[in-house]
């Protein structure tokens, strides 16, 4: 979980110390840096942050990215992945902001990999890469956790092939959409 989400889901009872979500997110960033120092010292070389609430209020994504970059800058040599989704609790999308609406945030991110939903969006996720010349890897959600069956290989291929316009095969990781933890166990 990233500093933006932590701030947005917290009840701030100390507005004298943290007058707004930005100040609170910066305070969380300091705590995250200290915690990450411990895991990096133990050998961790790959860290993923989740920031699903960026799609709930896209205007906050840029300051969220700036604070995330402050954390990342403390760990040269560590690879960072950022997961952004639509808040898929209970197999339903909770937030509807488009990735292209957050282009200013994407353009300043200092990440190695981006993890985005791809197959269940109401728009084309790949449009972001027309504006953002991202050179890292992509984890693309090509398995829809909202259906009660198994997708065909043809459907997964249909979701996957457009990625090749922007990424070489060695920079593509296929994954499920966010929210798989809410799929009933019998499925």
Where are the regions a protein language model picked out?
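Domain-level signal for soluble alpha/beta catalytic cores
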Residues: 1-187
């Amino acid at each position: 979980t990233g500093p933006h989400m932590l701030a947005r889901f917290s009840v701030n009872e100390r507005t004298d110390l943290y007058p707004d979500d930005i100040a609170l997110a910066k305070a969380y960033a300091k705590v995250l840096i200290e915690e990450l120092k411990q895991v990096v010292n133990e050998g961790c070389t790959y860290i993923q942050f989740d920031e699903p609430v960026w799609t709930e209020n896209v205007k906050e994504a840029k300051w969220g990215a700036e604070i995330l970059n402050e954390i990342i800058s403390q760990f040269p040599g560590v690879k960072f992945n950022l997961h952004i989704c639509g808040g898929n609790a209970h197999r339903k999308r909770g937030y509807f902001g488009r990735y292209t609406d957050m282009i200013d945030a994407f353009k300043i991110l200092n990440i190695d990999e981006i993890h985005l939903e791809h197959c269940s969006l109401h728009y084309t996720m790949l449009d972001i890469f027309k504006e953002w010349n991202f050179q890292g890897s992509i984890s693309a959600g090509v398995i829809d956790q909202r259906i009660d069956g198994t997708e065909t290989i043809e459907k997964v291929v249909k979701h996957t092939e457009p990625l090749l316009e922007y990424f070489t095969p060695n920079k593509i990781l296929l994954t499920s959409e966010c929210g798989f933890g809410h799929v009933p166990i019998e499925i």
